[in-house]
Amino acid sequence: MQQGRPHANSSIVNGKNKNLILGSFVRNLSIRVTEFSPYLCSGFKNKTKMRPYIICHMMASLDGRIDCEMTEQIDDTNHYYEALTQLGCPSTLEGKTTLAMHYAQDGVFQQQRPHEDAGQQLYKAVEAASYAIGVDTRGTLLWDDNTTEIFGRPLLMILSERASQEYLDYLKSKHISYITAGCNGIDLPSAMETLRAVFNVERLAVVGGGNINGSMLDLGLIDEVSMMYGYGIDGRGGMAAAFDGRPMDRKPVRLTFKSVEEQDGIIWARYQVNK
C-alpha cells in the first residue's frame, strides 16, 4: 500500500567470527556464517531475545477484505497513512505478493550459475532511521536500479537460507540490505530479533498482505492490531482477508480492545493481542 522510488548509497565491511553475537555487529556489515553448524538453520542468535514492538496496520472493507484496488475505492484519502504515522512505526514490513504488485519489476530472477544455498548471512547496505522491509523467501523479486528505497526508506529484504548466493550477490549489487534466516521457510522470530539488534528497529508496522499478517500472528509476533474499515463491502469470493493462511486447527487469537475513532466515515479500531 505504499509507493516511492528514490535511492540509497552503501558501503561494505566484511567479517567472520565464530564467537559473533548480534550486539557486537558494526555498521555496514556483510557476514556469511554457514560454518556455524549449530546455528545453520535457526537464524542469527540474539542472546537478549529482543524484537521490535509489532503492530499490524491494515485498511479493509467491512467484510475484512484488503484488495488494494478495492480499498482505494472506499478510502480515497490519506487516512491510512496518517494513522500509520500516529502509530509511531517508521519501519514497515510487507509480504512478497504486495511487493511484486506495487514495487518490484515484472518477471523473476533467473539464475545463471548452479544453485548454492546462501546459508546465514546479513548485509547492511546503509545506516538508516527506518527501513522498508520485505519478505521474499526464495529470492525471486527483481528491482530497478532506482528502487532501493520506498517512501524514502531503504529496502531491507528478509529471505530464507535456501535463497541462492547468486541472488544475494544481485541484491548487494543494488545496495539492498538483507537478512537470511531459516531453512524450511523464513525463521521470522529470528529475523525480528536481527531487525532489533542490528538494524535498530524498535517499532515495526506489518502492512500486508494477508499471508504475512497471518504468519506473524500465528507465531505470536503481533503485539497490536490496528484496523481501519472503509465505508464499503467487497463481497467477492476468493479475495484476501486481513489475516490469511493460519492452519485449520488453530483457535481464534483473542484481543483486548484499546480504542476506536471515526474519521470521515472510516472506523479506526485498535486492539492489543492477548499473549
Label each PLM-derived region with a short phrase:
Residues R32-V33, G43:
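Short Gly/Ser/Thr- and charged-rich N-terminal loops/segments
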Residues Q3, F36:
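Cationic, low-complexity basic patches in intrinsically disordered or flexible, solvent-exposed regions
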Residues G43-K275:
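Enzymes that bind and transform nitrogen-containing heteroaromatic metabolites
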Residues A8, G15-K18, V26:
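Short hydrophobic alpha-helical segments enriched in small aliphatic residues
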Residues L20-L22, L29, L40:
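Short hydrophobic targeting helices and cationic amphipathic motifs
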